[in-house]
């Protein structure tokens, strides 16, 4: 009874402590958000020029006052209690403290930066910019961000765990905002340079105003990324979260952007050469944004590829595999589209420009993704021994084999549905091949990818099996003290034991003498030595007894 109480009491106490921390930090998060919303509403009313504070929006003013005067003091009191508890190392090491800081840091950073950049961009080309509302929101949440950044960087009370989350959040957010805005600004500028000013209302908004607004967002996002990546020390962190963010955003997302932009550029050039249906201005419409996406995406991808080269071996291998996967997806999509368009031309040789455009799209996707995949994967230099197979390579092969197999299965089901629908129903218009050409192209592309990766996996699995040392069939089980070897069926039974001797102290028999334990023996393919029973195959069958 006492032992059970002593073992369950710490578990119950730990669960209650974790629940208490969770409730406290969740309540503090809610109160901080409530106080910031109320404060931003009051500041907006104070900054509004020519606006009465109460005006007609009594409910809005009452809400702002309640949030500020009730939620704000409660948040301050609860924060003071939490701050005093952080003198205990166990409180600083709890996951709740790190999650709270990361959550409020992310929300305050995103809201404040978005509001301030929106306010700055609203002054460009606007006759009456509405700056009071975004400025009040930006100031209130910027104060929350500065406060929590100070706690995150505190020399003593900073979180012991998840201390890299704010740097990662700031870097990823700034990189995404800066990249998207840079593509928009450069794309607008290139579009004007290629096609000229095509605005229908030039007297309302000139061509340079949206470019300049996008440039403001690009500069703001790049500043946030630089502050967290360089000044905040995110580049020097060697944690799994930083590696995942670097690969997921800097390699995967940037690679998709660069390949998509390059594919559209090749597609437009092919259409200019072989498919000039329609006005030239409409044909050149996607060229400017595509060039911008290819340029900015390639720049971001190249920087993170070089930055990942100074990290661990696993990070470098993962970045290479991710690049190969993105390029392979583009190339496989191109193969499927080419098969689809080829079947459409075979069904109707007099097909219009739509089929030709589809074929050019598939060729452009294959022309962009194929060389990048060949350079990243290097199919001519595959591992020849088990020692040269990277650990994550087999996971990559299994993932691509599984995904492509699922896609092929879905395409096969769609083909079967179209065939039975054509045979059983009164379907008019279009042949059977015309109905199944799209899923058939997808099936062929997915089948090729699945078969290739499965063949590689089988080959590398055989190399690993051949290189693994042969293991003896050993039964890891220690027998009892009085364990006896198996009964010998080919030998005569031993004679019965003699009667037990009489004890000299009484009429009863004495205790049987202790039987000596055999240290080793062998019986056929079984051998006993050192407390282990081992089975080893025999070269010749044994006919005699042991």
Predicted regions and their residues:
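Hydrophobic/aromatic interaction determinants used to assemble and anchor large protein complexes
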Residues: 1-411, 416-486, 490-500, 504-513, ...
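N-terminal beta-loop-helix "entrance" segment that forms/cooperates
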Residues: 512-520
